[in-house]
Design a protein with these regions (language model features):
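Metallocofactor- and cofactor-centric catalytic cores in central/energy metabolism, strongly enriched
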Residues: 1-264
């Protein structure tokens, strides 16, 4: 297990990449508010993985085709969320988000919103169960005040009401990494253990999240490659297996998977 160091040359390079991104983001989104978690919430789980009820929260912009799409026009973003029943056919899920390329996810939403993956892990006995609903945000929320005070706490409470043990979170765009880190920390604060996948560890570590798994994939594949359920299952299982071995809040573990192609 390779945990990203919080000091030294590699950390300084990531910090510089974050600073470069932070300076550039205002060219496109002048109202962006950098909003790191001031305190990292931390909940340990004592049960074995085979007894976990695992929930899913994504900032991919996924929603049912029958639901109102997310607002991709507002300068302040859209901090609302959509409830997606777990029995939903993945073909009935679409993505509304103009801030990353989700072309492959439009054909296989499971690479961003791993609804089928988690159901398969229940069948395989890897985890015990899943709740009745999963949750999706459109992660472009440059002004996250209402997310922090309203919608993220609502979702956290709904997960707690269903007695969810663990939540896995998957991001969409760059700003989504901050949005998802905020949501993650709020969920962890109600006593649910969480882990997020990150495609940009330089962003995630500056948001200060409980724990994360760095997947060196491009935007649009935060739960694995498209049209490869076996690899999606392997990745999500491996991410979940990190939870009991990560002991320090704020840790990011580098996963051993590599994308065969260009990554921005």
């Amino acid at each position: 297990m390779e945990i990203l160091e919080k000091e030294g040359p590699a950390y300084e390079r990531r910090k510089q990449r974050f600073q470069s991104w932070y300076e550039s983001v205002f060219k496109w989104h002048p109202n962006f508010m950098y909003t790191p978690n001031q305190v990292i919430n931390w909940t340990e789980i004592k049960k074995p993985m085979s007894e976990w009820k695992v929930g899913l929260v994504s900032s991919s912009g996924a929603h049912l085709r029958s639901q109102k799409p997310f607002d991709i026009v507002s300068d302040e973003g859209d901090w609302s969320y959509r409830e997606i029943p777990v029995e939903t056919d993945p073909k009935d899920i679409m993505i509304s988000d103009s801030h990353y390329d989700h072309s492959d996810a439009d054909l296989d939403v499971n690479c961003m919103f791993p609804i089928l993956t988690l159901k398969e892990l229940v069948k395989d006995g890897v985890i015990s169960s899943i709740p009745s609903k999963f949750y999706s945000f459109m992660g472009f929320v440059p002004v996250p005040q209402d997310l922090i005070t309203q919608t993220a706490p609502e979702v956290a409470q709904k997960l707690a009401d269903e007695k969810v043990d663990v939540v896995i979170l998957t991001p969409g765009c760059a700003v989504c990494h901050q949005t998802l880190g905020i949501i993650q920390n709020i969920i962890e604060g109600v006593g649910i253990t969480t882990i997020m996948t990150t495609l940009k560890p330089e962003l995630t570590e500056q948001v200060h999240v409980p724990r994360a798994a760095y997947l060196k994939y491009p935007y649009g594949y935060s739960a694995g490659p498209a049209n490869d359920l076996n690899m999606q299952k392997t990745i999500v299982k491996d991410v979940l297996e990190l939870i009991p071995v990560i002991k320090e809040p704020g840790s990011i573990v580098k996963m051993p998977y590599r994308w065969h192609g260009h990554i921005e």
